[in-house]
């Protein structure tokens, strides 16, 4: 029986990078006889233009029926002035919450070929391999009430709410421990337990879950210190688990240790490892349509999809090897280019990965 993959290119550079990822996926599908069927739909700004909402009901239903979702990027200045609740990003938040995609896995891996592209000294980041496990469907991005109001004195005031339940913390903590167990048995839980009530509960529950993982070394770190330590000595970390907002910020910070956010994939999983896969970067409207965006994060998201949702480790490994081979050849998009390398565009980079995959 065939497996269904829903492709959502999205906005900005999304359609450009997705085109290259789909080429790689179709080759892997054929070569490894994976039995995938691909369908395409719209999300974000593209959905607003077509349906008047950032995620149409029929698109959400197709996503529910699919075995995995492959996403490009959403958003852009074209839609910045519309009502907040129907902006493109709301489509992304909705599909995450409606599909129950509570666990976001964001690897930060420095390819040895890109050591010079990192913002830190090579000796600080050489061999870097961090996995950030981010809670994705709770916390301040979804908490109610949230409001902007006018006080009696005429001054505007806005507030948000940061709620976490014990069950939400427990399930993401287990993902963190499980990931640590298949890596190097080290987990750092990041919170702000010295200030926030939600973080105090977070730390208590993580400690309780740790009793089921005696082989995993657990440490705790306040988020401000974690942000500093990621720059000072990033290789002290292996797996980090944290809440929605902290994970959003720390994973972007970690991305720059690797040279470019254009290299980093991500997976968002439900309790059964059904997932949505997307690059960590945004829609980059400033370079959209120019054919210069880096498609490698999206291509590597395909690899994560094969690994986590379909248990196709051989095909996933092959795609990662193809990307590494292309970097060995000195091909670089502008975001990772350095002296002595050949600068290429989006399509040429995608074609190079396809060629490398064919020759493995």
Swiss-Prot record:
Record-annotated site: Important for catalysis: 141, 192
Binding site for Mg(2+): 224, 248, 252
Annotated pathway: Amino-acid biosynthesis; L-leucine biosynthesis; L-leucine from 3-methyl-2-oxobutanoate: step 3/4
Catalytic activity: (2R,3S)-3-isopropylmalate + NAD(+) = 4-methyl-2-oxopentanoate + CO2 + NADH
GO molecular function: 3-isopropylmalate dehydrogenase activity; magnesium ion binding; NAD binding
Requisite cofactors: Mg(2+); Mn(2+)
Assembly with partners or alone: Homodimer.
Binding site for substrate: 96, 106, 134, 224
Gene Ontology cellular-component annotations: cytosol
Gene3D superfamilies: Isopropylmalate Dehydrogenase
Key words of the record: Amino-acid biosynthesis, Branched-chain amino acid biosynthesis, Cytoplasm, Leucine biosynthesis, Magnesium, Manganese, Metal-binding, NAD, Oxidoreductase
Cofactor note: Binds 1 Mg(2+) or Mn(2+) ion per subunit.
Protein name: 3-isopropylmalate dehydrogenase
Organism: Pseudomonas aeruginosa (strain ATCC 15692 / DSM 22644 / CIP 104116 / JCM 14847 / LMG 12228 / 1C / PRS 101 / PAO1)
GO biological process: L-leucine biosynthetic process
InterPro entries hit by this protein: IsoCit/isopropylmalate_DH_CS, IsoPropMal-DH-like_dom, Isopropylmalate_DH
PROSITE patterns the record matches: IDH_IMDH
Keyword field contains Magnesium: yes
Locations listed in the record: Cytoplasm
Cystine connections: none
């Amino acid at each position: 029986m065939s497996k269904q993959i829903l492709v959502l290119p999205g906005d900005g550079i999304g359609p450009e990078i997705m085109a290259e990822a789909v080429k790689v996926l179709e080759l892997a599908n054929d070569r490894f006889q994976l039995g995938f069927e691909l369908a395409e739909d719209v999300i974000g700004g593209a959905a607003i233009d077509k349906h008047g909402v950032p995620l149409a009901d029929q698109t959400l239903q197709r996503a529910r029926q699919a075995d995995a979702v492959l996403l490009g990027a959403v958003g852009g200045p074209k839609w910045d002035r519309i009502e907040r609740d129907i902006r493109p990003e709301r489509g992304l938040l909705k599909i995450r919450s409606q599909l129950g995609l509570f666990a976001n896995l964001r690897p930060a891996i420095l390819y040895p070929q890109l050591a010079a592209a990192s913002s830190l000294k090579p000796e600080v980041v050489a061999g870097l391999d961090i996995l950030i496990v981010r809670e994705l469907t709770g916390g301040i991005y979804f908490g109610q009430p949230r409001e902007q109001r006018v006080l009696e004195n005429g001054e505007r005031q806005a507030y948000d709410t940061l709620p976490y339940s014990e069950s939400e913390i427990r399930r993401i903590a287990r993902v963190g421990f499980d990931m640590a167990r298949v890596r190097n048995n080290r987990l750092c839980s990041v919170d702000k337990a010295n200030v926030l009530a939600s973080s105090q509960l977070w730390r208590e529950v993580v400690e309780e879950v740790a009793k089921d993982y005696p082989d995993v070394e657990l440490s705790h770190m306040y988020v401000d210190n974690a942000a500093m330590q990621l720059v000072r000595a990033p290789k002290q970390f292996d797996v980090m688990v944290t809440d929605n907002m902290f994970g959003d910020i720390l994973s972007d910070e970690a991305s720059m240790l690797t040279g470019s956010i254009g290299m980093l994939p991500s997976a968002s999983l439900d309790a059964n490892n059904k997932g949505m896969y997307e690059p960590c970067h945004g829609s980059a409207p400033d370079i959209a349509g120019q054919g210069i965006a880096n498609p490698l994060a999206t291509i590597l998201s395909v690899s994560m999809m094969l690994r986590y949702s379909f248990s196709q480790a051989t095909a996933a490994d092959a795609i990662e090897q193809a990307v590494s081979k292309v970097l060995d050849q000195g091909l670089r998009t502008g975001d990772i280019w350095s002296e002595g390398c050949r600068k290429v565009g989006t399509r040429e980079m995608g074609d190079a990965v396809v060629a490398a995959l064919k020759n493995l």
